[in-house]
């Protein structure tokens, strides 16, 4: 389920994915942190017989010809190289592989940024009828409240004129959290991050032996 809520009035609408269970085998919304997804993928790859999995490797350059390609990576032990027939670059919006292939990333980046604060505070014990996914409307500022195992995540829009030092300051984080729910006690903050949102697409998805 997920809800649209008014900060003052409570739940305005609730959507139950269970109502479409006869239409799909997956009547739910999945929220999975990147580090957990990486662990799941690592375990799955091992079950598929993949033995060489490397962490803390940053691709720095690549060379390719008609026979294959070589990727060079910076590692804690220095530069290493890996050779093969094909390369798939699945390294996100700031893809090094895409940049090394000079593939344009056309579109734009939204000016608005989004601050995410994670806390073990149990909002469900304080806010009545709270879902695990909640979009809050308010005349002053909207926000998003999301439950993941062990934590609640609160997402706020951030003004363009706010600098990162101010955004991540302990006082500003606490001020935002108390605005969502005034507890009178400091929140235990587990994690904070600032996101940019891109509306972009790669100009093309293949460069000889490299795929995005």
Features from the language model and the residues they span:
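A structured beta-alpha segment of the ubiquitous adenosine-cofactor-binding alpha/beta core
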Residues: 73-80, 85
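Short hydrophobic core segments
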Residues: 33, 59, 82-92
């Amino acid at each position: 389920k997920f809800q649209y809520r008014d900060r003052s009035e409570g739940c305005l609408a609730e959507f139950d994915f269970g109502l479409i269970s006869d239409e799909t085998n997956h009547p739910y919304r999945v929220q999975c942190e990147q580090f957990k997804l990486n662990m799941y993928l690592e375990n799955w790859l091992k079950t598929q017989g993949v033995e060489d999995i490397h962490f803390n490797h940053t691709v720095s350059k690549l060379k390719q010809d008609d026979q294959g390609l070589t990727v060079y990576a910076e590692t804690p032990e220095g530069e290493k190289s890996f050779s093969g027939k094909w390369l798939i670059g699945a390294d996100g919006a700031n893809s090094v592989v895409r940049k090394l292939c000079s593939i344009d990333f056309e579109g734009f980046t939204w000016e608005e940024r989004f601050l995410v604060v994670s806390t073990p505070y149990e909002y469900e014990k304080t806010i009545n009828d709270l879902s695990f996914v909640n979009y809050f409307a308010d005349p002053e500022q909207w926000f998003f409240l999301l439950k993941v195992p062990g934590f609640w995540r609160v997402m706020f829009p951030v003004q363009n004129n706010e600098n990162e030092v101010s955004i991540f300051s302990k006082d500003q984080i606490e001020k935002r959290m108390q605005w969502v729910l005034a507890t009178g006690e400091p929140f235990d903050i587990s994690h904070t991050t600032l996101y940019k949102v891109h509306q972009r697409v790669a100009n093309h998805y293949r460069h000889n032996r490299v795929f995005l």
